[in-house]
């Protein structure tokens, strides 16, 4: 299936000069959504990642991470922006182009030596994915890979990620 044909391009969003890759058109397509989850699960199985948990990055990582976890027989754990989780958290601050941001995960969500796959809809510069990787590694988890629906190759996000399998289904 040609997933690119199901992803809408929106020029000048959220600001002039940016070409936004809109996944809502992929999400509304029944066959496209099913194929996306099945294909990502197949790639994870082929890589023999033996995942305990899928980590979904806020917020579109939740959309793909939850059904992927189900398909792989793993648990799903959300990583959220600061202040969005109600219980005690592990957190990490990371650099943005202009300032910093913070990611959090519940303290009781992950256990040392858990094998985790980090999932999001898109990798661009790799900043958020890299911070999520550092967060789960600080907890003592084994990061076994990343899964992305879209990869923006020109932004070279891969070079900021640990040396583990990186699965992307569509490249621009």
Curated annotation (Swiss-Prot):
Its EC number is 2.4.2.7. Keywords: Cytoplasm, Glycosyltransferase, Purine salvage, Transferase. The keyword Glycosyltransferase applies. It catalyses: AMP + diphosphate = 5-phospho-alpha-D-ribose 1-diphosphate + adenine. One of its GO terms (biological process) is adenine salvage. It comes from the Bacteria. Gene3D superfamilies: 3.40.50.2020. One of its GO terms (cellular component) is cytoplasm. One of its GO terms (molecular function) is adenine phosphoribosyltransferase activity. It is found in: Cytoplasm. Homodimer. NCBIfam families: apt, PRK02304.1-3, PRK02304.1-5. PANTHER family: ADENINE PHOSPHORIBOSYLTRANSFERASE. Catalyzes a salvage reaction resulting in the formation of AMP, that is energically less costly than de novo synthesis. Belongs to the purine/pyrimidine phosphoribosyltransferase family. This is Adenine phosphoribosyltransferase. It comes from Nostoc sp. (strain PCC 7120 / SAG 25.82 / UTEX 2576). The gene is apt.
